[in-house]
Amino acid sequence: MSCPVIELTQQLIRRPSLSPDDAGCQALLIERLQAIGFTVERMDFADTQNFWAWRGQGETLAFAGHTDVVPPGDADRWINPPFEPTIRDGMLFGRGAADMKGSLAAMVVAAERFVAQHPNHTGRLAFLITSDEEASAHNGTVKVVEALMSRNERLDYCLVGEPSSIEVVGDVVKNGRRGSLTCNLTIHGVQGHVAYPHLADNPVHRAAPFLNELVAIEWDQGNEFFPATSMQIANIQAGTGSNNVIPGELFVQFNFRFSTELTDEMIKAQVLALLEKHQLRYTVDWWLSGQPFLTARGKLVDAVVNAVEHYNEIKPQLLTTGGTSDGRFIARMGAQVVELGPVNATIHKINECVNAADLQLLARMYQRIMEQLVA
């Protein structure tokens, strides 16, 4: 017996949609949605394809996701070619199976079933889909959200299909995410010969006490919903490659994953004060890729928890751990935002796979969420 969720997932995997190339995935989704009465608005920006689709009116529940995938790596190391979906021992293999073409298929099939049973549903059901989530994310969801906000589009609830689960589908629901702030710092010195240090100014030596103090800071202790803020040095570069040249500059890149206990401005102020304390000559560039957001218990979280408990008989953990997602952009609209998707154990890896039965389960969960919020 064929399964529409598995079949649609396989069709999507066969399209090698390396970010930001959609490779025809959205056309497939749009065709299915238009067939059940959705109005579709394509919202392409630069090399990125996006669409916003809706059916009905009133209180709005949107399902959000991305059609793009990360590169497969060495295809010879896959048990099957990465863009040729294969089921082995109940597991569906292929790039994007878990992140997140399986979720997209589950969303669309859930919508088809929901509309068939509730053709005159009272709320509005919507989809926000992009082909630029895995790469720069500059022309994807953030641009669509800006356009929707500019015309006062309504969005009450949003479910992002990112692979949130750890061991079984629904064991973890993400009801928020930490903020992400990156600092690109250059410490300026004076280049010179290592035999004549008095004629130079070594920026590595100058910066060492600053960096030692920076990494020792306890930024906060987190709270009920968020772990403590984390600061990690990601890159350090200095020198010409020669052993007899004192470098003229030191470049340090570090990233903060921060909770709602802090703002990005508070972090910046503390870093800049520390730089001044150590009397360093520097230039600094900040990149805020997302503010922290949190969806407290309410109609959306309750509907998601209910759906998971109904179909999997487990109570999901509500967590805010992990990296950023497009939920950070959607939260700007004032919507309640949660993430519910398949098990994430193999995402971005060789032999990415998902339990085929989990995708069927996910479609049922998504449909039950629709029934609770917009039926």
UniProtKB/Swiss-Prot annotation:
Q: Pfam families, per this entry? A: M20_dimer, Peptidase_M20
Active-site residues (renumbered): 68, 133
Which keywords accompany this UniProt record? Amino-acid biosynthesis, Cobalt, Diaminopimelate biosynthesis, Hydrolase, Lysine biosynthesis, Metal-binding, Zinc
Pathway it belongs to?
Amino-acid biosynthesis; L-lysine biosynthesis via DAP pathway; LL-2,6-diaminopimelate from (S)-tetrahydrodipicolinate (succinylase route): step 3/3
In which residues is Zn(2+) 2 bound? Answer: 99, 134, 348
Per the UniProt record, which EC number(s) apply here?
3.5.1.18
- Tell me what reaction this enzyme catalyses: N-succinyl-(2S,6S)-2,6-diaminopimelate + H2O = (2S,6S)-2,6-diaminopimelate + succinate
Describe how the cofactor binds.
Binds 2 Zn(2+) or Co(2+) ions per subunit.
Record PROSITE patterns: ARGE_DAPE_CPG2_1, ARGE_DAPE_CPG2_2
Q: Which GO terms describe its molecular function?
A: acetylornithine deacetylase activity; cobalt ion binding; succinyl-diaminopimelate desuccinylase activity; zinc ion binding
- Binding of Zn(2+) 1, residues: 66, 99, 162
Cross-referenced CDD domains = M20_DapE_proteobac (cd03891)
EC class name: hydrolase
Q: Which cofactor does it need?
A: Zn(2+); Co(2+)
GO biological process per UniProt: diaminopimelate biosynthetic process; L-arginine biosynthetic process; lysine biosynthetic process via diaminopimelate
Is Nucleus among the key words of this record? no
The record's section on InterPro entries has: ArgE/DapE_CS (IPR001261), Bact_exopeptidase_dim_dom (IPR036264), DapE_proteobac (IPR005941), Peptidase_M20 (IPR002933), Peptidase_M20_dimer (IPR011650), Peptidase_M20A (IPR050072)
Assembly and interactions? Homodimer.
Family, as annotated: Belongs to the peptidase M20A family. DapE subfamily.
- State the function annotated in the UniProt record: Catalyzes the hydrolysis of N-succinyl-L,L-diaminopimelic acid (SDAP), forming succinate and LL-2,6-diaminopimelate (DAP), an intermediate involved in the bacterial biosynthesis of lysine and meso-diaminopimelic acid, an essential component of bacterial cell walls.
* Record protein name field: Succinyl-diaminopimelate desuccinylase
Source species of the chain: Escherichia coli (strain SE11)
